[in-house]
Design a protein with these regions (language model features):
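C-terminal alpha-helical "lid/dimerization" subdomain adjacent to the S-adenosyl-L-methionine
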Residues: 31, 157-215
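Conserved class I S-adenosyl-L-methionine
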Residues: 1-53, 68, 72, 174-177
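C-terminal lobe and adjacent flexible extensions of AdoMet/dcAdoMet transferase-like proteins
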Residues: 216-220
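A short glycine-rich, Lys/Arg-flanked "PGG" loop and its adjoining helix->strand segment in the class I
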Residues: 140-152
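A short acidic, Gly/Pro-enriched loop at the edge of an enzyme's catalytic core
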Residues: 115-126
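A short SAM/SAH-binding and catalytic strip from SAM-dependent methyltransferases
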Residues: 126-138
Length: 220
């Protein structure tokens, strides 16, 4: 499964940004079918707005992807200590290229697995996880590792596909997206995610739009 994920993102690196930013006509159709017409760009803006530009702590961005959504935000976060991790080396190289072009110097990048984060407990003040939790093969381990490395009082900020909201989206996720290696079952519903979060976090924001969930939760 891990090799399939790597190869799928290697294959898609030439059109990945157009797909997720709705830069082409076909990507607009993709979002209408998969996400129920939700504007992923707007949801990303809302999630990133939860992080102040003058944030001074340590933040983990996993998976960073190509940093197509985050580069402009990170240019403004000059006082933050940011670590960007991705399982796909191809995605990571594109993110690094963007960061260099933007002159960002307060970011460390590394290839790694969210299910085995190479960090001590209570390392990060914030963890940002955009478009990742529908991809990670071992979701239990991903949540566990994020919880372990997040400080008490730190925030987990996330957005991702959830099951049970849109029939067409669920069909596409289970068939085409899974077959291509871009999504990995099983997929949580909104209620599943609440059950994961509530024992360990105070849920500050929790929103479902189309087949996408985005939330902000503070570790107890």
């Amino acid at each position: 499964m891990a090799d399939k994920i790597k190869s799928s993102y290697k294959f898609s690196k030439s059109f990945y940004d157009d797909a997720i930013t709705q830069g082409k006509w076909w990507s607009k159709l993709y979002f209408k079918l998969l996400w129920g017409g939700v504007d992923d760009n707007e949801i990303v803006r809302r999630v990133l707005s939860w992080i102040p530009d003058d944030f001074k702590g340590k933040m983990l961005d996993v998976p960073v992807g190509t940093a197509v959504f985050t580069t402009e935000k990170y240019k403004r976060m000059k006082q933050a200590d940011i670590t960007c991790l991705d399982y796909s080396q191809d995605m990571l190289e594109q993110a690094e290229y963007r960061f260099r072009g933007a002159g960002i110097t307060n970011i460390k990048t590394m290839q790694g697995d969210v299910g085995a984060l190479p960090f001590e407990e209570n390392t990060f003040d914030n963890v940002l996880c955009m478009n990742g939790l529908h991809v990670f093969p071992n979701k239990d381990k991903a949540y566990s590792e994020i919880l372990r490395t997040l400080k008490s009082g730190g925030e987990l900020l996330a957005c991702f596909y959830i099951a049970g909201e849109q029939r067409v989206a669920d069909w596409l996720a289970k068939t085409i997206m899974t077959r291509m290696g871009w999504f990995t079952p099983p997929f949580d519903t909104a209620n599943d995610v609440r059950k994961r979060l509530e024992p360990y976090y105070e849920i500050l924001d929790f929103h479902v739009e189309g087949a996408m969930l985005y939330f902000r939760a503070k570790k107890r």
